[in-house]
From Swiss-Prot:
<dbReference type="GO" id="GO:0005730">
    <property type="term" value="C:nucleolus"/>
</dbReference>
<dbReference type="Pfam" id="PF21728">
    <property type="entry name" value="PADR1_N"/>
</dbReference>
<feature type="compositionally biased region" description="Basic and acidic residues">
    <location>
        <begin position="1"/>
        <end position="19"/>
    </location>
</feature>
<dbReference type="InterPro" id="IPR001357">
    <property type="entry name" value="BRCT_dom"/>
</dbReference>
<keyword id="KW-0328">Glycosyltransferase</keyword>
<dbReference type="Pfam" id="PF00533">
    <property type="entry name" value="BRCT"/>
</dbReference>
<keyword id="KW-0479">Metal-binding</keyword>
<dbReference type="InterPro" id="IPR012317">
    <property type="entry name" value="Poly(ADP-ribose)pol_cat_dom"/>
</dbReference>
<dbReference type="GO" id="GO:0008270">
    <property type="term" value="F:zinc ion binding"/>
</dbReference>
<keyword id="KW-0013">ADP-ribosylation</keyword>
<dbReference type="Pfam" id="PF08063">
    <property type="entry name" value="Zn_ribbon_PADR1"/>
</dbReference>
<dbReference type="InterPro" id="IPR050800">
    <property type="entry name" value="ARTD/PARP"/>
</dbReference>
<feature type="domain" description="BRCT">
    <location>
        <begin position="187"/>
        <end position="274"/>
    </location>
</feature>
<keyword id="KW-0539">Nucleus</keyword>
<feature type="binding site">
    <location>
        <position position="127"/>
    </location>
    <ligand>
        <name>Zn(2+)</name>
    </ligand>
</feature>
<feature type="binding site">
    <location>
        <position position="137"/>
    </location>
    <ligand>
        <name>Zn(2+)</name>
    </ligand>
</feature>
<dbReference type="InterPro" id="IPR036420">
    <property type="entry name" value="BRCT_dom_sf"/>
</dbReference>
Length: 814
């Protein structure tokens, strides 16, 4: 066996690295600087020490000094063991644990998982156990539960010089209560201003900031700092940002808010500055330490390194020598793994491949590292002369990484998640769209040789280009360059769906609150982002985040997987008209609607009448129609078929551009789950609206990508329509009976302006006016049907979003 390349010989966790740094310390007595509690005693507002009430703090410091000077490390371990405490921590931590135990009493087990509690940097007690096999425990408190029983003292300590001092604190009734330094409210006294499209809504951050002692201002006058999305600087910023810079106010990223809340204290503003240094590229900063928008820029520009199950990992360079994934007895020796443990802050991936190269031995490639921290990843490429030995080593590594056997997984997908072990990402045999679709340069050549109508060719060019899929995955944080999230097996997608549905039901029925509820959400988030490998996983907290970052993300990944399979590999010779070829595979007829026709005028009128500007921060975006396409698809009921059904309405459907190909190719799919939020409120339904404004919010992606598409579809609501002004408690009945549903919003279209199209299809086109349902969770009316055969896509409306109050000038490239 020959080792060709090794970038890092050992991949160690943070705990392991700390352990190595401590190896030089002498056993037994520890350095005073690391043994003793800090002597500085911060004070509360009333002047009391936060480490204890009154003299208790001083007494505790003297007690700690006595324990440190008189007990050996062996005696310390004996005290901890006899009182049922964990002794696996580093020695300096064991001393602090022992001092706390002897003075304040033995810690009880974690109320969430039964694990062991330890004091974390004198700020709060945290748990070292696991909630489940997916997630480490997230329990933390300043007032830990303690055993209401006398401390057990081993004989060796009873015979020590400080036995009388220790006995004094044995009785639970005589113990003072330990109070730790307060860091609960990091924003006390701060006025913070928000700007731009952050990963969480401004309303979310307003509540979070106020809950943590701060206030939010709509202006920058007198504020502590301005929190922005770094995307704002790329577009030149707004007057608000310019004003802040002119006043010398700190302009920081959203990560400052996130880290300050998580660490319970305000972080240094200068470390999160986004205007004095506009580029992090080349700094080698791990993505989890960057602002989400900065990470997105790097991940978006990174090339996909493995396109699917047969993809040789790009960094091996073996594909340049004709390398192919080794296959034997029906097994492909190419595995990808992910682990996301939000309790420990882990987000890592692993790649294992056996690669055959012409006129060479078998090659084994192994890579493991933190997401976005490529320079520090463990990576090796080894050449094996013995094929059987290489196969055995591959299987051994698989079991080491995943805690399961390779062959049962590869043949039958049998696997059981093990604590602290990776979980396989089940790649499919195909080419992910980020690799197989056409790049910008190739698109120009392909379009020039396309035999389709020029407008249709440009539309197909959008669907077959990498850009819309790259951006969609990037916005969701599901675009890791190492793993092909757009080429997953149906089994893996089904597993994701089952995990999501199981958790949705748990959310609906749970009575948990406080830290137990937080643990439940952390466990799901870790599980979800292990299956849906992300560049920026987050701990989800509520149903709105569940809808945005799980349900909607799943639907997008599912649809992109469909696009990957249809588009395939277009990287070859573009002179063979690949756009026409993919158009034929779609099984549909798409034609541009004449701008002088009645249909075109009807569509434009419907859009303009029911549209309201999309608002991002303090900027509003209007919309203009570029083209209207008529659609006839083999997968969708024809207009003649749909006209045979009752109660037909022409409605708007919002969609990302990345989801369009699937809609045309396969038809609409119902929502993946039922949640009490718009879009999911009526369960597993196909949801539309009579307001173009509602659809436009789904179609709008970002200010620097103003193009989008809205869908107009005919929906048959059936003979019976049920109206709701609040989320229905039971959506299962609606799904089973396939009853048409109308959700009444706070705004409605003026009914006197409605008209009919194609004889008996209602077009609810009218000015948006306030409705009598002022407390509805819906802003606009929503309509839901449960059978895809009740919907028929009629038009795709190509639109352009434009900032209101500005003049748009097209500039030719130099």
């Amino acid at each position: 066996m020959k080792v060709h390349e090794t970038r890092s010989h050992a991949h160690m966790s943070g705990d392991e690295q700390k352990g190595n740094l401590r190896k030089h310390k002498a056993e037994g007595k520890l350095p005073e600087s690391e043994q003793s509690q800090k002597k500085a005693k911060p004070e509360n507002d009333d002047g009391r020490s936060v480490n204890g009430a009154g003299d208790a703090a001083s007494e505790y410091n003297e007690f700690c000094k006595a324990v440190e000077e008189n007990l050996s490390i062996d005696q310390i371990k004996e005290v901890l063991e006899i009182n049922g405490q964990d002794c696996s921590a580093p020695e300096e931590t064991l001393l602090a644990q022992c001092q706390d135990l002897l003075f304040y009493g033995a810690l009880a087990k974690c109320p969430l998982c039964g694990g062991t509690l330890i004091c974390d940097n004198e700020k709060r007690f945290v748990c070292g156990g696991e909630i489940s096999e997916w997630c480490s425990c997230v329990f933390s408190t300043k007032d830990p539960p303690r055993k209401e029983e006398p401390v057990k003292i081993p004989d060796s300590v009873m015979n020590s010089a400080i036995s009388d001092l220790i006995k004094k604190h044995q009785d639970p009734k005589s113990r003072p209560k330990r109070e730790l330094g307060s860091a609960d409210k990091p924003f006390v006294g701060m006025m913070i201003s928000l700007m731009g499209r952050l990963t969480r809504t401004h309303q979310y951050w307003k509540k979070k900031i106020e809950r943590n002692g701060g206030k939010v201002s709509n202006t920058v006058q007198g504020v502590t700092c301005l929190v922005v999305s770094p995307a704002e600087r790329e577009r030149g910023g707004t007057s608000k940002m310019v004003e802040a810079m002119e006043q010398g106010l700190p302009v920081v990223s959203e990560a400052w808010l996130i880290d300050s809340v998580e660490k319970h204290e305000a972080q240094p503003l200068e470390a999160y500055d986004v205007v004095s240094d506009l580029s992090v590229e080349g700094k080698g900063i791990p993505w989890d330490k960057q602002d989400p928008s900065e990470e997105a820029i790097e991940s978006f520009s990174a090339e996909l390194k493995m396109y699917g199950k047969r993809g040789v990992y790009m960094d091996t360079k073996l594909q340049e020598r004709g390398g192919k994934i080794f296959e034997k007895d029906g097994l492909l020796y190419n595995c990808a793994f992910s682990i996301c443990d939000l309790g420990k802050g882990r987000n890592e991936y692993c790649i294992m491949q056996l690669v055959t190269v012409p006129d060479s031995n078998l090659n084994m490639y192994f890579k493991r590292g933190k997401v976005g921290d490529d320079p520090n990843a463990e990576e090796r490429l080894e050449e094996w002369e013995d094929e059987e030995a290489a196969i055995k080593e591959f299987a051994r590594l698989f079991e080491e990484i995943a805690g399961n056997e390779f062959e049962p997984w590869e043949r039958e997908k049998k696997i059981q998640k093990k604590p602290h072990k990776f979980f396989p990402i089940d790649m499919d045999d195909g080419i992910e769209v980020r690799s197989g679709a056409l790049g910008l340069r190739q698109l120009g050549i392909a379009s020039a040789h396309c035999k389709l109508d020029s407008f249709v060719a440009n539309f197909i060019k959008v669907l077959c280009g990498q850009e819309i899929y790259n951006y969609a995955l990037m916005e969701l944080g599901l675009d890791p360059p190492d793993l092909p999230m757009g080429m997953l097996t149906d089994i893996h997608l089904k597993r994701c769906e089952e995990v999501l549905l199981e958790f949705v039901e748990k959310v609906k029925t749970t009575k948990e609150t406080g830290q137990k509820a937080e643990a439940m959400w952390a466990d799901f988030s870790s599980r979800w982002f292990s299956l849906m490998h992300s560049t920026r996983p987050m701990r989800l907290h509520d149903v709105n985040e569940l809808a945005d970052h799980a349900a909607s993300a799943f639907e997008t990944v599912r649809d992109i997987n469909t696009a990957s399979r249809l588009i395939g590999d277009m990287r070859g010779d573009t002179l063979d008209d690949p756009l026409s070829d993919r158009y034929k595979k779609l099984g549909c007829k798409i034609s541009v609607v004449d701008k002088e026709s009645e249909d075109y005028k009807m569509v434009v009128k419907y859009l303009e009448t029911t549209y309201e500007p999309v608002k991002v921060s303090d900027v509003e975006y209007g919309v203009s129609v570029q083209n209207v396409f008529a659609v006839e698809s083999d997968a969708i009921p024809s207009l003649d078929d749909i006209k045979k059904l009752p109660n037909k309405v022409l409605l708007w459907c919002g969609s990302r551009s990345s989801n369009l190909l699937r809609h045309i190719y396969k038809g609409f799919l119902p929502a993946v789950c039922s949640l009490p939020v718009p879009g999911y409120m009526f369960g597993r339904a196909i949801v539309c609206s009579d307001a173009a404004a509602e659809a436009a919010r789904y179609g709008f992606t970002a200010v620097d990508r103003p193009e989008g598409f809205l869908v107009l579809a005919v929906a048959s609501l059936g003979e019976e329509v049920t109206e709701f002004t609040s989320p229905p408690e039971d959506t299962k009945t609606l799904e089973d009976k396939k009853i048409g549903v109308k959700g009444l919003g706070r705004k409605k279209t003026e009914e006197s302006e409605h008209f009919m199209w194609r004889d008996d299809i209602k077009v609810p086109c009218g000015r948006l006016v306030p409705s009598e349902h002022k407390d509805s969770p819906l802003e606009y009316n929503e309509y839901a049907v449960y059978d895809p055969k009740q919907t028929s896509i009629r038009f795709l409306v190509e639109v352009k979003y434009e900032e209101k109050g500005t003049e748009i000038v097209d500039v030719e490239p130099e």
